[in-house]
């Protein structure tokens, strides 16, 4: 089916003569066959958002409908790849066309020439259905790739073709003539089905103490990370990609500056995976849409990333989907909405911004897959609020749809406190659900310690305001002890070095032991001050400096060091009280 162009407005064009077309159908626009998607239908007229630059299009040029929705290719070869927002392989396109891509450039997302050794797990006569395991695809230098039956497919196996196969060649034939290849296609806007959702009672461990202990998120949960320029969003996301409890990382760079994306593309291949010792990129899929790329492709990029994440989830993997940033995605949505002449909402964003964000974040979750395995997609969405204003619409809509806020503070970043997570603003809605896991796995009393630490930090904020007015020396020893204990907690526990091998990640058991010792120091020093021991004498023991060095110790050495420090603390305080 084909029509003709009758109207153009930036990336949005209108074609007539497409009476049989459907919503979200992919079309090819103009003589250069630019990729587009139908977003509105009125009679035989279709409004199309074009995923490439539309300059030079002329009225009357042909528009050809494909009969298919916008879909991604899923199969062996995804890991380690870099795509744009509509899953065009950027490295292959750069090799063919140079650093600047021409319009209409198109290549299959997965390499059709590469052969994979297919080791089948089914035999003729077996009955298979969606989610069932077909086998494993292997290739030199690539991780093993589990091949599963696409959702909605059911049948009895009539023939199995093992051995060297390309991704588009039939590997399993079913009765009735249906064929299954290593490759499948899936519409990006349609969530992949699962057998059932599982309760969110297992944490998504990030390796960052401030997140895991104070603001945990469940596996399959959602978190929003608002932060202005220079607050460390990219470094935090790299730390999460490297140390978080995820088998696969899908990183979506949505509308960020080209220089920042170039830096990410340059640094990610050099990051070492601590699990395997190989490059981190080997278990990462990157989707890159810089701010100078067409806004329509920016809008589609987060759905492309989500479809890929759900595909790996259906293999029984834990997937971390990181979007940087949803603000740029919302700005693309605002621009497209304005081109469509829709009624604007707050700050010009479309009125359906909240429902679109909620529908997207609802695709996260920990599930039992159709094949009976357990998989999860955990979403971490960065937000770039103008001027750090958390009351703007994108941040507020994200907060209503997600389970945690990890707010990054410019003030902490300027003080070189990383991760610059502001504990006075951040929150989690899942702390109570995950408390049982931390009590079992980290240590009994974990929740009580966390609450005590947060009260200490809150008390420090109150006293800091008083100290600014009257000076620290005017405070009583008990109040100055609160300031000192909170300083030790901030610098020795909440702050973490991404460059220190022992401190870059922290298991829950180490974090529990550290937190218990910090708070024990505060309580026992408080008792000594109450008994008349001068605070200066307690500080002169040097035990505070030893507390700060706990973070630099490997996890296995922390219990012994903590026991020695606890004994020295008892001895020092007993001596001071006896004097």
Swiss-Prot record:
Catalytically driven reaction(s): ATP + H2O + 4 H(+)(in) = ADP + phosphate + 5 H(+)(out)
Protein species of origin: Anaeromyxobacter sp. (strain K)
A single BP term in Gene Ontology: proton motive force-driven plasma membrane ATP synthesis
GO molecular function: ATP binding; proton-transporting ATP synthase activity, rotational mechanism; proton-transporting ATPase activity, rotational mechanism
Domain of life of the native organism: Bacteria
HAMAP family noted in UniProt: ATP_synth_A_arch
Protein's name in the database: V-type ATP synthase alpha chain
Cited InterPro entries: ATP-synt_VA_C, ATP-synth_a_Xtn, ATP_synth_asu-like_sf, ATPase_F1/V1/A1_a/bsu_N, ATPase_F1/V1/A1_a/bsu_N_sf, ATPase_F1/V1/A1_a/bsu_nucl-bd, ATPase_F1/V1_b/a_C, P-loop_NTPase
UniProt keyword Transport, yes or no: yes
Function: Produces ATP from ADP in the presence of a proton gradient across the membrane. The V-type alpha chain is a catalytic subunit.
PANTHER family recorded: H(+)-TRANSPORTING TWO-SECTOR ATPASE, V-TYPE PROTON ATPASE CATALYTIC SUBUNIT A
Binding site for ATP: 227-234
Keywords: ATP synthesis, ATP-binding, Hydrogen ion transport, Ion transport, Nucleotide-binding, Translocase, Transport
Gene: atpA
């Amino acid at each position: 089916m084909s029509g003709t162009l009758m109207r153009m407005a930036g990336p949005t064009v209108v074609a007539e003569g497409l009476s049989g077309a459907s919503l979200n159908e992919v079309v090819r626009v103009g003589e250069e066959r630019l990729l587009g998607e139908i977003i509105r239908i009125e009679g035989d007229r279709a409004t199309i958002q074009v995923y490439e630059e539309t300059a030079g299009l002329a009225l009357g040029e042909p528009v050809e409908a494909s009969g298919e929705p916008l879909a991604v290719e899923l199969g062996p070869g995804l890991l380690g790849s870099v795509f744009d927002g509509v899953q065009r392989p950027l490295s292959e396109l750069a090799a063919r066309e140079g650093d600047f891509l021409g319009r209409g450039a198109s290549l299959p997302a997965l390499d059709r020439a590469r052969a994979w050794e297919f080791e089948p797990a089914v035999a003729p006569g077996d009955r298979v259905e969606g989610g069932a395991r077909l086998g494993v695809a292997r290739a030199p230098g690539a991780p093993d790739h589990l091949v599963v039956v696409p959702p909605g497919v059911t049948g009895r196996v009539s023939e199995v073709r093992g051995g060297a196969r390309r991704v588009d060649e039939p590997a399993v034939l079913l009765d009735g003539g249906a064929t299954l290849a290593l490759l499948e296609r899936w519409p990006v806007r349609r969530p992949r089905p699962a057998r059932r959702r599982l309760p969110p009672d297992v944490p998504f461990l990030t390796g960052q103490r401030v997140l895991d202990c104070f603001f945990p998120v469940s596996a399959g949960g959602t978190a929003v990370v608002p932060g202005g320029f220079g607050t460390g969003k990219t470094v935090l996301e790299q730390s999460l990609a490297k140390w978080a409890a995820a088998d696969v990382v899908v990183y979506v760079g949505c509308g960020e500056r080209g220089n920042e994306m170039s830096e990410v593309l340059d640094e990610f291949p050099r990051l070492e995976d601590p699990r395997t010792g190989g490059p981190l990129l080997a278990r990462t899929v990157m989707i890159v849409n810089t701010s100078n790329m067409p806004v329509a492709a920016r809008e589609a990029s987060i759905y492309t990333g989500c479809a890929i994440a759900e595909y790996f989830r259906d293999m029984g993997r834990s997937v971390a989907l990181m979007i940087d940033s949803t603000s740029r995605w919302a700005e693309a949505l605002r621009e497209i909405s304005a081109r469509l002449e829709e009624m604007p909402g707050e700050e010009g964003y479309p009125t359906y911004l909240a429902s679109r964000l909620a529908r997207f974040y609802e695709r996260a979750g920990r599930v039992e897959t159709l094949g009976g395995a357990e998989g999860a997609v955990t979403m971490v969405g960065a937000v770039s609020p103008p001027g750090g204003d958390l009351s703007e619409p994108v941040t507020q809509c994200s907060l209503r749809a997600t389970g945690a806020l990890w707010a990054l503070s410019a003030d902490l970043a300027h003080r070189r406190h990383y991760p610059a997570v502001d504990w006075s603003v951040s929150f989690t809605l899942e702390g109570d659900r995950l408390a049982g896991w931390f009590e079992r796995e980290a240590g009994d009393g974990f929740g009580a310690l966390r609450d005590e630490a947060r009260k200490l930090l809150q008390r420090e904020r109150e006293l800091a305001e008083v100290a600014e007015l009257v000076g620290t020396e005017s405070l009583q020893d008990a109040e100055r002890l609160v300031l000192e204990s909170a300083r030790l907690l901030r610098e020795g526990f909440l702050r973490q070095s991404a460059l220190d091998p022992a401190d870059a990640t922290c298991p829950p058991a180490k974090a529990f032991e550290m937190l218990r010792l910090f708070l024990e120091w505060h309580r026992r020093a408080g008792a000594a001050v109450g008994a008349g021991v001068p605070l200066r004498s307690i500080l002169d023991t040097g035990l505070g400096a030893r507390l700060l060095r706990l973070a630099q110790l490997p996890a296995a050495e922390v219990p012994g060091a903590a026991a020695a420090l606890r004994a020295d603390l008892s001895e020092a305080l007993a001596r001071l009280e006896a004097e």
